[in-house]
């Protein structure tokens, strides 16, 4: 769903990228049919895309808020296209004055890295957009090394303006440029990719923690006999535990302090979320959360 155009040469580096993401939900077979027609250029408008998606019973979500290109420093720009599924596949282009790198990443592994020097143009995107952009560049790109950076920016903007009719490209786009050479180019790339891997690790931990929290929430007792009063405290039956808070790693208790009008030997029940003494309407309260073990 992307279009990224990157120029690098003796006069600097320029990168432009659209912001569109399209998500497909439905049968894999029909998704492939829709994607093939979309990326081949057969579908020529959002209206046509929505109509065919409805016909194929595919739900599509279009978002135009992903910044695919960025300026890492005053000497390096970067762009990324990605495919997220069971595996996360990324292709990144980094550029500085007179140099660029193309990096392929699979999940948390760099699978390929190519460094190019001198001047050139890198176009990333689906095959239809890539072909159209390259056709436009043939007319002007040979003059880029002799142009001021601003003029190159304008030329790349013009290509985005010409292609934004296509449903895989957003109407808005981002352009960044630098005119300095980064002597530690490969080190900058390494650190930037390491930050991606750290982010992915943090995200994994957050998802694990979220899963733990949801598991706890789903185990909160709504109904049932949970324990008995002994020595003025609630002693929970084997199937239950008490926790101090909804958290991935809460403190766990089998005996807890409770408040209410009760006596030793009373059985405590939970009915529709309310804790009380069995056979009475005497409510019992505690600062703890009772969950299934």
Swiss-Prot record:
Chain coiled-coil ranges: none
InterPro entries: MJ0548-like (IPR016754)
Pfam families assigned: MJ0548_C (PF25274), MJ0548_N (PF09894)
Protein name: Uncharacterized protein MJ0548
């Amino acid at each position: 769903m992307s279009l990224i155009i990157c120029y690098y040469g003796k006069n600097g580096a320029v990168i432009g990228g659209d912001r569109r993401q399209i998500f497909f939900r439905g049968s894999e077979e029909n998704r492939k049919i829709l994607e093939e027609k979309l990326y081949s250029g057969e579908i020529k408008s959002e209206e046509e895309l929505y109509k065919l998606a409805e016909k194929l019973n595919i739900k599509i979500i279009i978002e135009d808020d992903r910044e695919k290109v960025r300026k890492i420093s005053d000497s390096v720009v970067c762009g990324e296209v990605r495919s997220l599924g069971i595996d996360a596949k990324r292709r990144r282009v980094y550029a500085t004055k007179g140099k660029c790198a193309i990096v392929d990443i699979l999940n948390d592994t760099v699978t390929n890295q190519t460094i190019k020097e001198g001047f050139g143009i890198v176009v990333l995107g689906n095959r239809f957009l890539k072909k159209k952009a390259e056709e436009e560049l043939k007319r002007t790109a040979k003059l880029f090394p002799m142009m001021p950076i601003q003029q190159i920016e304008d030329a790349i903007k013009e290509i985005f303006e010409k292609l934004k009719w296509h449903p895989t490209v957003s109407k808005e786009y981002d352009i960044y440029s630098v005119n300095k050479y980064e002597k530690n180019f490969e080190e900058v790339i390494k650190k930037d990719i390491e930050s991606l891997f750290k982010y992915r690790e943090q995200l994994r931990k957050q998802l694990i923690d979220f899963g733990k929290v949801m598991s706890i929430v789903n185990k909160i007792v709504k109904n049932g006999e949970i324990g008995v009063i002994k020595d003025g405290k609630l002693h929970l039956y084997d199937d239950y535990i008490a926790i101090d808070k909804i958290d991935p790693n809460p403190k766990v208790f089998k005996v807890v302090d409770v408040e209410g009008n009760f006596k030793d030997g009373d059985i405590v029940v939970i009915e529709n979320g309310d804790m009380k003494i069995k056979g009475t309407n005497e409510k019992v309260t505690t600062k703890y959360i009772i969950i299934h073990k």
